[in-house]
């Protein structure tokens, strides 16, 4: 199968919106068993985001990862445009990638669902055990990597 370019939007506007590295890593493990992938990691310089980035870069997937944290927005936009799919916390990158026409799986852990499903290019994933999501859901540890993987396969098929 051809290589797929995946944007991982690790950035989040606050600690309750940043899905832990483990969830991204578990998803990466699932997807690389079925597809040849390149991962583009979108983070800010915030210390918590850098920790998540370093945790991902210390895995066996590091050679397939490209960190975007030293690039300007002008340099990042064409990279996003060349991704086949994007998996982002509810953050600037989920809005940018869906706005650029990229199918975007939005990890909704702590904000109203509307923020992550207003575009036909957005596919929200909500925490396990919830029927919807809002400002105090605090579900970042309950985002299920299997559901992300299932959604990716549905989009790509």
Name the predicted role of every residue range:
Residues 9-10, 89:
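Short, well-ordered coil/turn residues at beta-beta hairpins
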Residues 1-6, 33-34:
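Nucleotide-sugar donor-binding and catalytic loop/hinge architecture
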Residues 10-12, 129:
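Short, histidine-centered active-site or binding-site loop motifs used for metal coordination
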Residues 6-8, 39:
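Conserved hydrophobic helix-helix packing surfaces used for dimerization/oligomerization
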Residues 13-20:
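A short, glycine/small-residue-rich beta-strand->loop->alpha-helix junction that serves as a flexible
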Residues 23-110:
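Donor-binding and catalytic core of enzymes assembling or modifying cell-surface/extracellular glycoconjugates
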Residues 95-156:
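Nucleotide-sugar donor-binding patch of glycosyltransferase catalytic domains
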């Amino acid at each position: 199968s051809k290589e797929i370019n995946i944007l991982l939007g690790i950035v989040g506007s606050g600690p309750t919106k940043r899905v832990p590295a483990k969830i991204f890593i578990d998803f990466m493990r699932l997807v690389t068993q079925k597809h040849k992938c390149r991962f583009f990691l979108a983070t800010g310089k915030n210390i918590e985001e850098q920790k998540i980035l370093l945790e991902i870069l210390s895995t066996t997937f590091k050679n397939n990862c490209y960190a975007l944290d030293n690039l300007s927005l002008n340099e990042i936009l064409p990279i996003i445009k060349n991704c086949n799919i994007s998996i982002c916390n509810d953050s600037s990158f989920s809005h940018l990638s869906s706005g650029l026409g990229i199918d975007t799986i939005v990890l909704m852990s702590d904000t109203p669902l509307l923020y992550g499903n207003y575009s036909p290019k957005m596919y929200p994933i909500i925490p396990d055990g919830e029927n919807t999501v809002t400002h105090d859901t605090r579900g970042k540890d309950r985002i299920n990597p299997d559901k992300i993987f299932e959604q990716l396969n549905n989009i790509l098929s």
